[in-house]
C-alpha cells in the first residue's frame, strides 16, 4: 500500500480541514485506512487481506514528511539485524526531529531525539550495528551473535565506507568488528 499524509495534498490549494474531511470520508468508504492522526494508508489488498507496510517503512515515511532522519535502536535494531528473534512490543528509533510517541495502527513507536553523530554513518549496517551492540552491551555478546555479525559484515557491499564507520563507534565495538574483518581476509 501507499502511505499518505494530509500535507501530500497541500498543492491542491485546499484548506487542511477540508482535506482532512475528504480523507476521513474516503476512510469511511473503505478506500483508506487511518494509521494515525493525519497518516493514512491506501491499502493493497491480496486474497489474504490488506498488506500493511512495515513499521520501518511507516517511520521512514513520517521522517521524510518531517524532513528528519531516523535510526532504529535498541531491540528494534537487534531484530532488524537478526541478532534477536524477539519482536519488539514498542519500536524505538533515534530521530533528528522531535521526540514523540506514535501509535501506527496497533503498533507503538517511540522517536527519541538524538545527537548528529548517530546519523553520520555512511552505511546502514554501521549505524544499525552500533545501536544493536550498544543495546546488548560489551559483556553480553554471545558466540551466536558474533557469527551473525560476521555474516552481516561479510555481506556488506560498501566495505570501505563501513570501515570508515568504525571510527564513529566506541573502542570496544571497533575491536570486535576489526577482529571480524581480520577473519574475512580483507
Predicted feature residues:
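Amphipathic alpha-helical interface surfaces
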Residues: 19, 73-74, 125
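Hydrophobic alpha-helical interaction segments
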Residues: 114-186
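Short gly/ser-rich loop at a beta-strand->alpha-helix junction or flexible surface loop bordering the NTP-binding
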Residues: 35-38, 66-104
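Short beta-edge/loop segments at beta->alpha junctions of small alpha/beta modules
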Residues: 1-62
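A short, charged helix-loop
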Residues: 103-113
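A short, terminal or domain-edge coil/loop segment
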Residues: 1, 56-65, 85-99, 125-130, ...
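Alpha-helix N-cap/loop-to-helix boundary motif
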Residues: 51, 62-69, 73, 121
Amino acid at each position: 500500500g501507499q502511505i499518505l499524509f494530509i500535507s501530500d495534498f497541500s498543492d491542491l490549494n485546499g484548506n487542511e480541514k477540508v482535506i482532512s474531511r475528504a480523507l476521513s470520508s474516503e476512510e469511511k468508504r473503505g478506500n483508506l485506512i487511518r494509521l494515525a492522526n493525519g497518516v493514512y494508508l491506501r491499502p493493497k489488498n491480496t486474497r489474504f487481506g490488506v498488506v500493511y507496510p512495515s513499521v520501518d517503512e511507516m517511520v521512514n515515511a513520517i521522517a521524510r514528511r518531517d524532513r528528519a532522519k531516523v535510526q532504529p535502536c535498541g531491540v528494534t535494531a537487534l531484530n532488524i539485524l537478526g541478532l534477536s528473534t524477539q519482536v519488539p512490543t514498542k519500536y524505538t528509533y533515534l530521530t533528528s526531529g522531535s521526540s514523540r510517541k506514535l501509535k501506527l495502527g496497533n503498533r507503538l513507536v517511540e522517536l527519541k531525539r538524538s545527537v548528529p553523530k548517530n546519523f553520520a554513518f555512511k552505511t546502514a549496517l554501521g549505524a544499525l550495528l552500533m545501536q544493536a551492540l550498544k543495546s546488548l552491551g560489551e559483556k553480553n555478546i554471545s558466540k551466536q551473535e558474533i557469527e551473525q555479525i560476521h555474516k552481516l559484515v561479510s555481506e556488506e557491499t560498501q566495505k570501505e565506507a563501513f570501515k570508515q564507520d568504525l571510527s564513529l563507534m566506541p573502542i570496544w565495538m571497533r575491536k570486535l568488528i576489526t577482529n571480524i574483518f581480520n577473519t574475512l581476509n580483507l
